[in-house]
Design a protein with these regions (language model features):
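Short catalytic-loop micro-motif centered on adjacent basic/acidic residues
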Residues: 55-58, 79-84, 161-163
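Metallo-beta-lactamase
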Residues: 14-18, 24-26, 30-31, 113-165, 169-257, ...
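Conserved beta-strand hairpin/beta-sheet module of binuclear metal-dependent hydrolase folds
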Residues: 21-73, 173-190
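Divalent metal-coordination and catalytic microenvironments
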Residues: 34, 48, 58, 87, ...
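Eukaryotic low-complexity, intrinsically disordered regulatory regions enriched
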Residues: 2-6, 10-13
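Active-site HxH/HxHxD metal-binding segment of metal-dependent hydrolases
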Residues: 63-65, 71-150, 251-257
Length: 259
């Protein structure tokens, strides 16, 4: 994402959601002994550390101060060999784009097979005015394509993949070591409790409807999501996420992070 496009998106998104109290990123720092984050304006990049391995979750904007802030955490960009990508929006892949400073040129990207279709130009987002017409993203990193329900290992770190289409067709959520759920933009919290991000930016809201109406445990998930968000009208994202694997609801710890 070019610097000009980055600045446009940052300003446009801030204007669109003014008053919603929806952008509440965590400040740069360690959240616990395993998870840290870097704040980039209204977004977060997350890091999961286990032993000598540090895995990055999403790549944020094309952000000038990323290396500096990683230094605050004691993380050398050269030590990042694995990056989990939830989806290819330009505020999630900016640091691995071809026109980025190249901090992570040697890192392997893990991305859903469906979401990868955006990267290679097979799929495009709907255009609403101009804002949601995503530019073609060029990435040269090695990629491993993932599928719903896939479980794989990175240096002793267990990663389970859940496909949650709606925000994008191939949005992927990652459950790491059966303890940490990295949701990308599946769950947003606003001033009114929960915010239906799917209904505002979804390519096809029918996807969300299918997720919350079909399958065993769907009604339980709807009720559970409503209790989290307090307002049924704003609970779509929570219902969507929980219906991915309703029999394992105890694993879906809701954290107040925006991106």
């Amino acid at each position: 994402m070019s610097k000009k496009a980055t600045e446009f998106q940052r300003k446009a998104m801030s204007w669109m959601y003014r008053g919603k109290e929806i952008f509440k990123p965590l400040n740069t720092g360690w959240i616990d002994e395993n998870v840290a984050c870097v704040r980039e304006w209204v977004a977060n990049i997350f890091f999961y550390r286990k032993g000598d391995t540090t895995i990055m979750v999403d790549a944020g904007y094309n952000y000038d101060r990323l290396a500096e802030k990683m230094g605050w955490l004691g993380i050398d960009p050269k030590s990042i060999h694995h990056i989990l990508i939830t989806h290819q929006d330009t505020d999630h892949v900016g640091a691995v784009k071809a026109d980025s400073p190249g901090l992570f040129r040697n890192a392997k990207l893990y991305i859903g097979e469906i979401e990868n279709r955006y990267l290679i130009g097979e799929a495009r987002r709907k255009v609403i005015y101009h804002l949601y017409k995503l530019p073609q993203v060029t990435i040269y990193n090695e990629k491993q394509l993932l599928h719903d329900g896939e479980v794989f290992d990175i240096d002793g770190v267990r990663i389970e993949c859940f496909l949650v289409p709606g925000h994008t067709w191939g949005h992927m959520v990652y459950l790491v070591d059966e303890k940490y759920l990295f949701t990308g933009e599946t769950l947003w919290f606003g001033a009114d409790g929960g915010y239906s991000f799917i209904s505002s930016l979804a390519e096809d809201n029918k996807l969300a409807g299918c997720a919350v109406t079909g399958g065993a445990g769907a009604e339980t998930a709807r009720t559970w999501a409503a209790s989290i968000f307090h307002h049924r009208s704003h609970g779509m994202d929570g219902q969507f996420c929980l219906c991915v694997c309703p029999q394992r609801q105890e694993l879906f710890t809701i954290q107040k992070t925006s991106t």
